[in-house]
Structures are given as C-alpha cells and as structure tokens.
C-alpha cells in the first residue's frame, strides 16, 4: 500500500510539474551569434520552395536569400530561424544552401520561449493556444495537427507516462495537463481509452459498459475549457454587451458544433470498431422523447450563463429572466445518434448501473445545451454567481437525497471499484426508501418563504454542518480514480455519522434540497466533464412530480420512463410560471447570500483537503479525521485556495475588462462607420448642391444677358432721336463692370503667371541643387572608389612585402644552414689536416730514419768497397766475379761483415753473401723509391689541403659578408615594414575619418535631399493647384469672354436690325424730304416764273442762271444753303464703348468719328478685344455729314476734288487702290465691320481717314436707293471721306456720275483742274457753288497725300492662356495688316515687323 501511495504522490507531483511547465517550445537549446541572438550568423540561399505549417515558419521560394540568426539545437537541429525582408520564422536546414558565413563561433544557450506568432491563425503561446484560437474561428486550429513528423508531436514526446501508471491512475490526467482544445484528438482519446481499458480490467462488466458509454465525455472538454480565464468564443465576446442571453446562445451553438465535430472525428470511429449494440435504455427511447428533449433543451439553454453564469446578471439586477424562451429550435443539442453509445452485446448490465449509464447519457445530452464555457470549472460558484432558476436544469428529486448526493457527485472512477460499487448500491437502496418522505417535504417546502428562511438560517460556518449536497467534485487534474473512490467512502461515512445529516429534520432537508439545486446547477458543467452523473430516483417519485405538471402529453412521456432520463426530462419540462415565485425569492436571497459566498470560497478548500487526504498513504489516512485535521495542512490548503481564488478573481476581472474593451471597440467601429456614411452622404449632398448652385449661377447669368438683350431690343428709334441717356449709361456701366472684371481676371492671371514663373525658377533652382547634389554624390562615390582602390593597392603592396620578407627570411635561414654546414665541413677538414700533419710528421721521422740507415749503408758500402779493393786478389783467383757481381757481393757483405770476418776464408760463401747483399740493396732501393713517392704524394695532398682551406676561408669570409649584408637588408626591410604599417594605419585612419565625415556629409545631404524632396513635393502640389486654378480661371475667363461675345453679337445683331430699320425709315424720310424740296423748288420756280411772267411775259426764253442751282437737281435753295434736314444721320449702335458713330460703313473712321494717328499697341489690343476704331470720338475736326445720308448736292460737292499743285491727275499714285473684301454671308453692319477693320494711313497735313465698305452693303443700298435716280450704278473707285475738295468755279455741266458709297465699287470722274489756293481740306460750310455748269463732271478725288498706304507691322498674338491688358480708352481697333491686300503702289516706308 505504501508503494501505491508513493506512486500516487509522484504522479501528482509530475502532473503538477508538467502543468506548470507547458509545451510551447520547439527545442530547449538554440545556437546564436551572440547572447541576444541579434547577430547575423550566415546568409543562405533557398534550394526549393517551402511553405510552413503555421505562421511561425518562414515561407520562401527557390532562389531567395535568407539571413540566419538562430539555429535550434537538441532534437530540432534541422530547424533554423531567420528573416527574409520583414518576415521572420523557422525553416528546415535541408531546404537552403549556405552562401556566406559571417560568424564561425556560435553561442549555445537554452531556449526561454519561442517568438509570439501574431500573423497566422492566432497566438502560438503555451497552453492557451485553443482559447486564443477559438476567438478567430469555431474550428480550432492545431499547429501540430498537420505535421506527421514525430518531432513535431510535442504531446506524445514531451510527457508519456509508463503503462503501469494507467492501472492505478486516471487516464485523463494527461488530458488535463494538456488542454483539450490544444492537444490532438487522437492523442487525447487514445490516452483516455487506455486508462479506461486498464481500469475496466479491474472492474467488471458493468464498469466496461460505463466506460463505453462515457467515451464521448472528453469531447466536451474543449468547449468547457474554451471558457477558462474568460477566453470564450468570438461570438460570445461580440454579443456580451448587447444582451444577457446572446452570449449563452452563441456559446451553446458553438458547443453543438464542437460536439458534432468531435463525435464525427477519429475517436468515434475508433470506438465504433468493436462490435457493439445499443442498450435497451437508449433503444427504448422513442422519437417523441427526442423531440421533447430538443424542445426542453432550447428552453434550458439560455439559462446557462457566459463565463460566470446567470447569477451575476440576477444579482446585479440586469438579467433577463425569460430570455431562454427566445431561442429557436435550431440552437438545441445535436441528436442522440451523434453520441456513441454501443456496448458489447454479451455483457449484462445490472439495473442500477443501467440507470446510471442512462442518466449519464442524459447528462451528456442535456449538458451540451445547458453547459456553457465558464472561466473556471472547479465546481464552485465564484461569489455566488450561480443560476437562480435551478429547477430548469436539475431534477427535483435527485438532489435532496443524502445517499444519492454522493453518487451524483462522484466521478467516473467510482464505478470502477467493485467494493465501492457495492457500498454505493446499498446507499442507493436506502435513499430510494426515503423518496416518499422527501417528496412530501419537497411539496411542503415549495413556498418561497420557507426556502428563504431555510437557507438564510442554515449554519454555513463549518464543514461538519454542511449537507452532503454541498460537497463538490474535484478536478481530474489532481486525483485519480481510486483516490476519488476512497474519498467518496469517507464522505459517505462521515455524512451518515454527522448529527446534521439525519433525514428527520424537514427544515434541514428542505435547505439541503434548495442548496443541492443551486450547487448542482453550478457544478453541472464540471460534473459532466468528470463523468459525474445523476442518480435516478424511484418511479413513485416521478409519478408524484408528474402529477403537478400541466401538459398531459408530457406527463405520459415522463411516466413511461422510470429512469433518470425521464426524471430529468420531467424536470426540464416544468413551466417557468410555476417557479416564478421560487426564482424571485432566490434572486433576493442571492443579494444577501453570505452563505453562497462562503460555501463557494470554502468548497475548493474542502475538496483540496479531501484530495490531499486521499493522496496520503493508507496508514496516514486512517488516523486522519476531516473534522480534526492538523493545523499545518489546513494553513497550507487555505493559503493555496486563497491564492487560487485571488488568481482567478484577477483573471476574471481581466476577462471582463477585455470584453468591455471589445464591446467598446465594436461600438466605436459602428459609430465610425455611421459617421463615415454620414460624411459620404453629406459630400454627395454638397456636390449636388454645388451643381445646383452652378446651374443657378449660369441660369442667372443667362437671365441677366437676356435681360440686357431685351433692354437692347426695347430701344426704339424715332425720327431724328438718339438712344436714351439712361440706357446708354446702363450700357456704359455694364461695360465698365465687365472691363473691371476682365482687369481683375487679367491681374489674377498675371499673378498666377508670376507665381508660375517663380515656381519654375524654384523648380530650376531645385533641379540645379539636385544636380549639384548628384554630382557631389557621384564625386563622393568616385572618391570612395578611389579610396577603395588605394586601399586595395596598399593591401596588394603589403602582401608583396610580406612575400618578399618571407622569401628573405627563408633565404637567410638557408644561408645560415649552409654556413653551419660549411663550418662543420671546415672542422672536419681541420681534423683531416691534423691527421695528415701527424702522418707527415711520422713519415718525416721514418724518412730521417731511412736516411740515417741509408747513410750507414753508404758508409758500410764504402768500407766494403775499400775492403773489396783490398781483396782484388781474391777476384783474380776465383775469376768468377765481375764488376757487377762484385758490387753485389760488397753490398751483401756489408750485412754479413761479421760473417765475413768470421769466415774470411771461404770464397764461395763470400760470393753468395755478395749476391745476397746485392739483392738486399735492390730491395732497399725500391723501398726508398716508394718512400719518395709517398712523400711526394703527401706533399701534394698537403698543398691541396692548404689550397682547399684557403678557398674555404675565402668562402667563409664571403658568406660572412653576405650574412651581414642580408642582416642589414632584413633590418632595413623590417624598418620599411614598420614604416609602411604605420603609414598604412595612418592612411587607414585618415580614410576612416574621411569616410565617416563623408558618411555624415552624405547623411546630411540625404536629409537635405529629403527636405528638398518634401519641398519639391509641396512645390509640385502648389504648382498643380496653381495650374488647376489658372486653368479654372482661364476656363472661367473663356466662358465669360464667350458669353460676352455672344451677348455683344446678339446685341450687334439686334442693333444692326434696328439700324436697318432706321435706315429704311431715313431713306423714306429722305425721299419725302426730296419730294418736299422738289415740290418747294417747283413752287419757288413757279413763283419765280410767275413773277417773271408778271414782270416780263417773255422771260421764259432766258437761260436760268440762278445762284445755287448747280448743286441740286431740283434747283438751288432759296436761302442759298442746304436744307436743315441734311444733317448726318447716326449710325446704328453696337453697344460697345465710345460715343455714337456716324455710319457702319466707314471702317476708317470717316466723318465725325475720324481722328488722328493712334498707337499701334492700342490698335492691336482693341483689335483683340473686338473694339472698333469708329467707336470713339477724336480730337480732329469732324466732317459735316456722312456721305451715304447727305443730300445729293453734298454728295456732288464732295465728289469734286482738285489735285495738289504740280501733280497731274493721271499719276497712278493719286489713284486709290480698290479694295475688295469677302462677303461674310450675312447682312453687313457693325458685326461685319468688327471682323474687317482697316488700319489708319499715314497722314501728312492732317487726318485723312479712309472710308471702306463691305461687299454685302451694295445690294442693300442699291435696294434702298431704288427711289433715287441714277443710284444703282456701281462705282469704279472708292469714295473719299471728308477731305474732298470742292470745285472752285462752276464748270460746264455734264451728266452726273451718281455714286453710292454703300456699294462695292466707286467710280472716279475724269481729271479736273486743281482748285485755287484756299482751304486745302474742303470748302467752307457756307460755300455752295452752283450746281449746273457746263463741261465734264468733276472727278471725285479724296484729300489725301501722294504717298502710298503703309502697312503696319503685325502685333504678336498672345500665347494660350494669356489675355492682353486693357486698352487705352482713346485707342481704337483697326483691321490687322495681314488682311490688307498688297498694294501695287510703291511704299514710301518699308513695313516694320515686330517679332517676339
């Protein structure tokens, strides 16, 4: 037993350690370039395309460069981490190739945490993966689910318990350590399945069935734990502030979807592989019950609250009590067929176990709708935040039985122990016997006041006084199955022995019933998660409860099923109206619920205490009493519980604040979208109003134009009347206003042009500066390149010097070695010389000895010779010896002197000795020769050795000198190397400083360039705005000019029509005047004739020579002057500036409107603006009248002219060129004259304006002058203006040449003598010469100079968008000289052309 306890404690410690450790690291070791992992390790090149499983991995394509900063170690050495641009993540090592290595020494360090991934599906952050991912999508993404590599499976690799632990521990312990939403489904279900199989092997058949029926329970862990710490689903967060029931609806919907996903996943397939059949309880449930369940679940679902339940909404007074009725049927639970509930057919299940399993399945069905994600599911109500309407969730009879409460609150593990199961059955039988009495007590306690008083006066201040139904289950994270079973046994015994546990107290029973309802409602999500199921009661209690129901169909359904499922369905079908009073009382009770708060605060401490006691060994646990536990354990448990409460309160506050923040963000987003929509609508309205305003403005302008045109049309010309002064003033004012506006527009245009020029200059300056900066940058780049090249040259020189130094050092070492070898050789030669000296000395000694022996021999020979000479007689006696033999005998006798002395008498013996002596002498001579040769050889060797020694000594001296030279050279090279290195360092420092300065300068230039770019951008924006404004102004000015031109044209048309009408009236008036004058002349003539006849009846035959008759076809005026009606008629108005005109047919300004020379600029400006030269008065004297409207005698008088003195009439220079102008296709008048204006001619003595006519006037004037005799004959030449010379004397009258100046051509009469000196311009106004005179008619000759008309240079037309300044008020417009036909007369002055 001690070993089992030790195993339990170790398992508990390991589970707590793994819970705290988490599984969020890919590897525990990593390699970096520095301690901060900020240094670039290497740069790699992608060999293939790669796409990571989640956002923590880096995606890249083939050929991209990646900077490596981190290399994972340990089991994940195949993963590196690096960046590509702005993206950072992990990538496999085999997908890249190292291109360049920056750091060879890497620092290995432990991995604290992986980086936080925010760009993918959600956070990859420890064990909160599922909660955070659940906000993004209902479908929970697992980062390791798609990876089949075993290295990626952190769940199976990080913590894998031993198989023997499953036999003694609950298999779901690992599931609690790893959140269900984070771990893969196959691992979670496989681990629990193994645990249940191991536990089921110790139990029995009923335990196996229970395990099979509960296989789907872990699937609810994911929606449950999604609500931990306030991290619910996204739907609940979005609608938490809209209503109190909407979060419940959204969470219930998500739970349904999660259940469907988990039931249809791999665990279901895994469980269904075994041959199983559905139990009778599940198969016996009819389809009507399923429909009733779905209906009741749709009612129960809104009662389940969000993260802390409906209790808070009821407690704070803002809950919605009837919100659950608003749910639709589609939000109910998934059907029963989604839940795997098959068991082996060969197993027989007892009735209590069958009831329990059926109730478990019912809990699974109902909890999927009632269950909502809470922020903590340890089974206690935080701050009493529980559901008030508990009758809709928990059955009325399963919660107020003492014996059943333990069974209702036990986890699954309690079903796996046969002994505990037998005890639980006994307790169940006892509690079923008490069902009748408790049902009566329940009926009596239904009143609200009893419940209120029972709960209010119940004593909550002790664990012993707490009823059994307040004991809450503990999480599977801390206990295994056996611990819970033992704990259940202790709780049952202590409850049965407690004084407050007796069932005889009705008040206590009722209070227990109420509290059990409240606690069961709070504990329902966790009970379902831990496998806690409702214990069914007897069918009698079901019948009693069903009697109070209103619906007979529901009663029948409830009564047909005696199981806990039917009871739970009956409880769910209770109408909310029946529990309205109870709910109201409970709501008031919750407002002062001190008991609920203390029970919820102390219940986890009690549970933790029981779990600790259950985890203790059996000997220690036998001595432990829950009523008298030790102080140290209590303090420890209390501290842990308080810490947990504070932690979860803080987390709840954070979750509430986050939800409020999300709601506020959504409200602000909605408000912002509404404001944006309103802004768009307002902008549309503004644009519509602006368009309407522009339309109204244009319509007002058109209306003003029409008004002015109607005013111009309303002008009526009366005989001899002019335009009214008021109309004239109005027109002048409007014209002055228009001129002022044009001036303002031109000033604005000039200002815009000046701004444009300034901006152009600024742009030019900026471009110059940019160019200069670019040149500077290029120069800096070139300098940097030069510095790099010089640096490279220095490096190359340094390398060369290093190579030369190495070569010199190698050569020096070789020389030193050769010197050493030579020294060794000299020593050896010295030794050989010494040996040879020794040999020489020995040879000399031997030579001396040989010489001494030789001298002795010679002396002996000499003695022998003497002795032989003495012995000549012997030779003669013997006769055998000769000279040669004698010598040999003598030599041999030297050796044997003694023998000779001893044997002086033997002659033969002497000869023998002589022969021997001779032989020995020969041998000695040979030896001597050999000694001589050896001595000569030794001498030769000695000489050779001396010579060799001398050569070696010379070589040694040369090598010594070379050594000294090399040493000096090496020293010089070292000094040079030091100097060069110093120079190199100095140059490097200088270059570095220069580079830093240039870099700073470049940065400053870049900053300046950025500022200049900003200025350029601003300038370009301003330029664009100015251009747009100028364009708008130009368009507006063009529109204004077009409107004004249209107005002027319309007015001119109307004035022309009025003028034509006035001219016809004037012609009629002239006809009448002519008729009157003719009649008056006839009358005077008749009177004169009558007087003459009275005086002289014969006077009629005398020719008429009266004064003044020459000038009138009707006779002279009686007063001798033209009639008063011959004044000039006004020309039609054109509504332009200037005074009234005389005639529209005088483009040169003849008559009153003529004036002196004018300015060319003004002329051109007036021409551009459409002003006429005949619109203004001049200072020159006016002509008496217009020729077209003057009487005939005026016309005849003007046609007579005289050439100047000394100039004949036949001179072609005096004849004016006829000018033809094309017909414009419409009636002639002011509008025609605006297009064809002639320039003024040079004048000598005064203004001599030319009178031109258009081609269209001839027809009209011919038609108008049809009443005048001799008028429709076309003239051959152009008539002159006011400068015609009158005839000085009455010539002989001839037929007149009628001239109509309004026709296309004019005729010239024949030459006439020049006039007498007098007025060179014209005759005086009082002078009227006689009309009738004999002779040819007077030629019409204008009073002009003899010079040809001079063409004026054209004025350069303005460019597009430019309007000329306003003209001088005295200026007038004339026809441009390009419209003047070329003159055939020689020009006096050449034309001057102005070119811009």
UniProtKB/Swiss-Prot annotation:
Residues of the signal sequence?
A: 1-22
**Localization (cell):** Endoplasmic reticulum membrane
Specify where the region named Disordered lies, as residue ranges. 197-288, 331-361, 396-421, 525-557, 1103-1396
State the taxonomy lineage: Eukaryota, Metazoa, Chordata, Craniata, Vertebrata
Tissue-wise expression: Isoform 1 is expressed in liver (at protein level). Isoform 2 is highly expressed in liver and weakly in testis.
Which GO terms of the molecular function aspect are on file?
Answer: cargo receptor activity
Q: Which domain of life is it from?
A: Eukaryota
Low complexity bias: where? Answer: 1135-1146
| PROSITE patterns tied to this protein | SH3 (PS50002)
An annotated GO cellular component of this protein is: endoplasmic reticulum exit site
Coiled coil residues, start to end: 693-867, 914-1082
GO terms (BP aspect): cholesterol homeostasis; endoplasmic reticulum to Golgi vesicle-mediated transport; lipoprotein transport; protein exit from endoplasmic reticulum; protein localization to endoplasmic reticulum exit site; triglyceride homeostasis; vesicle cargo loading
> Per the UniProt annotation, where are the glycans attached?
59, 366
Query: According to the UniProt topology, which residue ranges lie Cytoplasmic?
Result: 650-1396
What is stated as this protein's family in its record? Belongs to the MIA/OTOR family.
Which residue ranges run through the membrane? Answer: 629-649
**Species of the source:** Mus musculus (Mouse)
Domain comment quoted from the record? The proline-rich domain (PRD) contains repeated PPP motifs. A single PPP motif is necessary and sufficient to mediate interaction with the COPII coat subunits SEC23A and SEC23B. The coiled coil domains mediate interaction with MIA3. The first coiled coil domain mediates interaction with PREB.
What does the UniProt record say this protein does? Plays a role in the transport of cargos that are too large to fit into COPII-coated vesicles and require specific mechanisms to be incorporated into membrane-bound carriers and exported from the endoplasmic reticulum. Plays a role in the secretion of lipoproteins, pre-chylomicrons and pre-VLDLs, by participating in their export from the endoplasmic reticulum. Thereby, may play a role in cholesterol and triglyceride homeostasis. Required for collagen VII (COL7A1) secretion by loading COL7A1 into transport carriers and recruiting PREB/SEC12 at the endoplasmic reticulum exit sites.
**Positions of the UniProt region annotated as Proline-rich domain (PRD):** 1105-1396
Composition bias of kind Basic and acidic residues appears in 1165-1179
- Residue ranges for the region (Mediates interaction with MIA3) are 651-1243
* Name of this protein: Melanoma inhibitory activity protein 2
Q: Which residues lie within the membrane without crossing it?
A: 605-625
């Amino acid at each position: 037993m001690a070993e089992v306890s030790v195993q339990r404690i170790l398992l508990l410690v390991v589970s707590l350690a793994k819970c705290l450790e988490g599984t969020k690291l890919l590897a525990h070791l990593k390699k970096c370039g520095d301690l901060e992992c900020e240094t670039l390790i290497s740069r790699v090149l992608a060999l293939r395309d790669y796409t990571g499983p989640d956002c923590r991995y880096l995606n890249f394509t083939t050929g991209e460069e990646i900077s490596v900063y981190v290399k994972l170690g340990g089991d994940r050495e195949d993963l590196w981490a690096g960046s590509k641009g702005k993206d950072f993540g992990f990538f496999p090592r085999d997908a890249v190739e190292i291109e360049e290595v920056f750091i060879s020494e890497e620092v290995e360090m432990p991995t604290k945490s992986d980086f936080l991934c925010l760009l993918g599906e959600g956070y990859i952050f420890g064990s909160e993966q599922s909660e955070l991912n659940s906000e993004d999508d209902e479908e929970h993404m697992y980062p390791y689910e798609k990876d089949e590599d075993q290295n990626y499976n952190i769940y199976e690799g990080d913590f894998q318990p031993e198989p023997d632990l499953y036999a003694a521990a609950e298999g779901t312990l690992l599931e609690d350590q790893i959140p269900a939403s984070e771990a893969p489904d196959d691992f979670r279900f496989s681990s629990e399945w193994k645990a249940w199989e191991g536990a089921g092997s110790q139990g029995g058949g009923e335990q196996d069935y229970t395990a099979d029926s509960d296989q789907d329970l872990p699937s609810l862990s994911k929606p449950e734990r999604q609500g931990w710490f306030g991290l619910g689903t996204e739907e609940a967060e979005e609608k938490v502030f809209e209503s109190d029931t909407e979060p419940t609806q959204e969470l219930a919907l998500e739970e349904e979807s999660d259940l469907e996903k988990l039931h249809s996943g791999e665990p279901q397939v895994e469980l269904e592989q075994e041959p199983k059949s559905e139990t009778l309880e599940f198969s016996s449930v009819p389809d009507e019950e399923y429909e009733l369940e779905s209906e009741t679940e749709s009612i129960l679902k809104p009662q389940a609250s969000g993260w802390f339940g409906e209790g808070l909404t009821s407690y704070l007074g803002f809950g919605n009590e009837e919100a659950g009725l608003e749910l639709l049927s589609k939000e109910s639970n998934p059907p029963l067929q989604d839940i795997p509930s098959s068991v082996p057919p060969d197993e027989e299940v007892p009735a209590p176990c069958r009831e329990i399993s059926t109730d478990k399945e019912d809990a699974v069905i109902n909890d999927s709708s009632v269950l909502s994600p809470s922020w903590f599911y340890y089974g206690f109500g935080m701050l009493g935040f529980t559901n008030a309407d508990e009758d809709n969730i928990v059955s009325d009879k399963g919660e107020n039985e003492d014996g059943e409460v333990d069974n209702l609150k036990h986890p699954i593990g309690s079903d796996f122990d046969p002994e505990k199961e037998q005890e639980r059955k006994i307790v169940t039988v006892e509690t079923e016997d008490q069902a009748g009495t408790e049902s009566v007590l329940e009926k009596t306690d239904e009143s609200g006041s009893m419940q209120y008083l029972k709960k209010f006066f119940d004593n909550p201040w002790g664990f012993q006084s707490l009823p059994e139904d307040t004991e809450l289950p503990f999480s599977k994270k801390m206990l295994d199955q056996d611990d819970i079973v033992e704990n259940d046994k202790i709780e049952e015994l202590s409850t049965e022995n407690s004084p407050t546990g007796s069932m005889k107290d009705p008040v206590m029973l009722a209070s227990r019933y109420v509290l059990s309802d409240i606690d069961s409602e709070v504990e329902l999500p966790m009970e379902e998660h831990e496998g806690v199921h409702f214990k069914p009661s007897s069918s009698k209690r079901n019948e009693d409860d069903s009697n109070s129901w209103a619906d007979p169909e529901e009663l029948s359904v409830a009564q047909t099923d005696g199981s806990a499922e039917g009871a739970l369905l009956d409880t769910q079908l209770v109408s909310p109206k029946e529990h309205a009073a109870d709910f109201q009382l409970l709501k008031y009770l919750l407002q002062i619920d001190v008991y609920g708060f203390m029970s919820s605060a102390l219940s986890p401490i009690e549970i933790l205490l029981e779990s600790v006691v259950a985890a203790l060994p059996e000997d220690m646990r036998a001595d432990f009493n829950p009523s008298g536990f030790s102080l140290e354990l209590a303090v420890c448990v209390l501290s842990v519980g308080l810490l947990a409460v504070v932690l979860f309160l803080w987390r709840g506050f954070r979750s509430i604040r986050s939800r409020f923040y999300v709601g506020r963000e959504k409200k602000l987003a909605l408000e912002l979208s509404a404001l944006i929509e309103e802004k768009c609508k307002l902008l549309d309205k503004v644009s519509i109003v602006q368009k309407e305003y522009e339309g109204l403005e244009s319509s007002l302008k058109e209306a003003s134009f029409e008004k002015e045109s109607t005013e111009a049309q309303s002008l009526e010309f009366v005989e001899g009347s002019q335009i009214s002064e008021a109309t004239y003033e109005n027109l002048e004012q409007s014209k002055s206003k228009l001129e002022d506006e044009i001036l303002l527009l031109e000033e604005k245009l000039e200002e815009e042009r000046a701004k444009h020029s300034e901006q152009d200059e600024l742009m030019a300056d900026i471009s110059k500066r940019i160019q200069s900066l670019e040149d500077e940058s290029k120069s800096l780049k070139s300098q940097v390149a030069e510095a790099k090249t010089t640096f490279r040259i220095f490096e190359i020189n340094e390398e060369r010097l290093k190579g030369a130094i190495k070569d010199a050092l190698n050569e020096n070492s070789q020389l030193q070695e050769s010197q050493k070898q030579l020294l060794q050789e000299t020593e050896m030669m010295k030794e050989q010389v010494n040996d040879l000296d020794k040999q020489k000395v020995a040879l000399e000694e031997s030579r001396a000895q040989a010489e001494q022996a030789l001298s002795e021999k010679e002396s002996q020979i000499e003695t022998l010779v003497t002795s032989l000479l003495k012995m000549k007689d012997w030779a003669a006696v013997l006769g055998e010896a000769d000279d040669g033999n004698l010598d040999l005998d003598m030599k041999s006798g030297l050796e044997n002197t003694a023998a000779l002395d001893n044997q002086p008498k033997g002659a033969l013996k002497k000869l023998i000795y002589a022969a021997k002596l001779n032989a020995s002498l020969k041998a000695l001579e040979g030896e001597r020769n050999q000694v001589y040769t050896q001595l000569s050889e030794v001498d030769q060797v000695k000489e050779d050795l001396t010579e060799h020694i001398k050569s070696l000594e010379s070589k040694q001296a040369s090598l010594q000198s070379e050594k000294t030279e090399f040493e000096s050279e090496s020293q010089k090279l070292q000094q040079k190397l030091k100097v060069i290195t110093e120079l190199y360092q100095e140059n490097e420092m200088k270059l570095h400083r220069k580079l830093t300065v240039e870099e700073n300068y470049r940065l400053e230039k870049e900053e300046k360039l950025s500022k200049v770019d900003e200025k350029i951008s601003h300038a370009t924006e301003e330029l664009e705005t100015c251009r747009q404004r100028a364009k708008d102004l130009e368009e507006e000015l063009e529109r204004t000019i077009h409107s004004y031109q249209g107005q002027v044209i319309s007015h001119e048309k109307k004035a022309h029509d009025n003028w034509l009408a006035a001219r016809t009236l004037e012609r009629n008036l002239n006809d009448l005047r002519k008729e009157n004058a003719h009649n008056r002349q006839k009358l005077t003539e008749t009177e004169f004739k009558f007087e003459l006849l009275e005086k002289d009846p014969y006077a009629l035959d005398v020719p008429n020579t009266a004064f003044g008759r020459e000038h009138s076809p009707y006779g002279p005026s009686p007063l001798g002057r033209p009639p008063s009606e011959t004044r000039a008629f006004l020309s039609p108005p054109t509504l332009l500036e200037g005074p009234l005109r005389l005639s529209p047919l005088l483009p040169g300004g003849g008559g009153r409107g003529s004036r002196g020379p004018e300015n060319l600029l003004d002329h051109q400006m007036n021409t551009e603006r459409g002003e006429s030269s005949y619109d203004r008065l001049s200072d020159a004297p006016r002509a008496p009248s217009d020729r077209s409207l003057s009487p005939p005698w005026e016309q005849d008088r003007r046609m007579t002219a005289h050439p100047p003195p000394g100039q004949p009439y036949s001179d072609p220079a005096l004849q004016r060129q006829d000018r033809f102008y094309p017909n414009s296709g419409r009636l002639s008048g002011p509008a025609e004259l605006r297009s064809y204006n002639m320039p003024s001619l040079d004048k000598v003595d005064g203004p001599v304006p030319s009178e031109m006519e258009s081609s269209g006037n001839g027809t009209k004037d011919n038609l108008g002058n049809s009443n005048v005799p001799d008028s429709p004959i076309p003239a051959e030449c152009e008539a002159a203006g006011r400068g015609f010379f009158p005839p000085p004397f009455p010539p002989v009258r001839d037929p007149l040449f009628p001239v109509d100046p309004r026709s296309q051509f004019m005729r010239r009469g024949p030459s006439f003598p020049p006039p007498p000196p007098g007025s060179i311009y014209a005759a005086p106004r009082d002078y009227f010469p006689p009309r009738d005179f004999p002779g040819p008619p007077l030629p019409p000759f204008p009073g002009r100079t003899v010079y040809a008309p001079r063409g004026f240079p054209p004025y350069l037309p303005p460019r597009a968008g430019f309007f000329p300044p306003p003209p001088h008020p005295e200026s007038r417009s004339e026809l441009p000289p390009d419209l003047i036909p070329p003159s055939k007369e020689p020009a006096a002055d050449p034309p001057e052309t102005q070119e811009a």
